């Protein structure tokens, strides 16, 4: 099953990229308070970076990792997340629909889940996208 949401943020792609991708570890818990992240090293995020994660979203907390699998500045960030026994392939796509605005599409592929789970996962992704938009537009 795949889920994907798109939002348009009234800021240039450089600012959205910096907030979402470059400072992902610091900012992800701000838009998704059910997630705690910690980089395994102090190096900047790039392909191969491993991030430890803990999710308290559902009844049983799960520990796992995120590995950056693609990192094209101001265009694409892809991750492979090991969330307990599940592997999730996630992405964030960045485009510029007009000057000073950024279209951010976030999505994930959730193998083994059927489409009935969309009603649980999609609202969480929509909440995250709305919070990302609000945080970026209010801070920068």
Residue spans of the language-model regions?
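Beta-strand/loop substructures that line and gate deep hydrophobic ligand-binding cavities in soluble
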Residues: 78-127, 131-134
